[in-house]
Structure formats: C-alpha cells, structure tokens
Amino acid sequence: MQRLDLATIAPTPWKNGGGATRALACWPPGAGLERFGWRVSVADVAAPGPFSLYPGVDRQILLLQGDGVHLRAADGSVDQALDRATPPFAFAGETAIDCTLRGGPVRDFNLMLRRGQWRGALRVWHGACTPGESPAGLCLVLAGHWERAGEAYAPGQGLWWSTPRPGVPLRPVPGGLDHPALAWVALEPEI
C-alpha cells in the first residue's frame, strides 16, 4: 500500500499541449504512456482542444473542479456534457474527442485501462471503504477529512495498491463541513 499526495506530484504537459497531468499511479510502476497496463491521473485542462488519442485503451473521466466540459466526437459517437454532479464517463481512447470548456479551466480525474490487460471502475464513494479489497486500485480524497489506522487524509491525499491485502478501513472523520467524498478505483487483471 502506497500513500500519495497530489501536492507533491509535479505536473507533466499533455501530448497535445492543452493542459497538464499529475500521474498518481500506474502499472507497472514507472511505465510510460505506451506501456502501462493501467494509469490513474489528475489533469488540469486550461484550454479547449482535442484529447490525445490512446488506441487500445479504455478511459474513464470524472470532473473534480470547474464549470464543466463538453466532449464531442466528430463521428457522433460521443456528445457528453460533464460537470461535478455527472458520474464518471467512459469512452474508448482511440475515439477522436474534442473538448470545450463550459467556463474557465477545469480539473478532472482520469482512469486509463489497457484493453485486454486490465478492467476497472471509477466511482465516487462517500462512506468507509477498505483499500486492498481489489487486486489493485487507488483512492483519492476529494472532500472532507478521512482517517485510516490513526493517519489523517485530507483532500488530494490517498492510497494505491497493486496486490490484494484488505486491512484497515479508510473512514470519513465526522463533524467536517464538507460532505466526504473519495475517488475510488477498483482494478482487476484480465489476463
């Protein structure tokens, strides 16, 4: 189980130059964009433009901050508005998607899965959960304060794992002003 903190991860410019990404975790560790089995990141989108293409990769996106985006594919297969109330949206990485901003810059959470190698789901979770229940995964605090085995977790902090080792639950700390929320990713190998 590895602890992570978004504030300590340096941003990397996108392949298409329209924003920057902070890679939270990937498998295998240190794998580049052409070799990962799965990858989880947080992106800052500063300008409208096309998404980078990732053939053979299934993607899921969740808006975290900002007024929202509208995703459209030239072939009509995608026409989706996303805001902070929208559940995670899944699409194929080889689909040519254009992104327009519905206001200013936005921040989103991204899950990318190499098709035929990994499958998984991105959800927003509000109650206690147990990291390590799935073969691999990641959780990131989005709102509220959380606690696990006496360690505090604030927004932007979390855990990732690559082997199933259920252990101590991660729980929201009662009494906070924010409604507690986690980005929760559960992953399983397909092969």
Regions found by a protein language model. Name each.
Residues P28, D44, Q65, A73, ...:
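Short, structured patches in soluble enzyme cores that scaffold and shape functional sites
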Residues K15-G49, D58, I97-C129:
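A short glycine-rich, His/Asp/Glu-containing loop-to-beta-strand
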Residues A43-D44, P48-A92:
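Short, well-structured hydrophobic secondary-structure segments
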Residues M1-A23, F36, V40, G68, ...:
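Cytosolic regulatory regions built on CNB/CRP/Popeye-like sensor folds
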Residues R84-W118, T163-I191:
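Ligand-binding loop in jelly-roll beta-barrel domains
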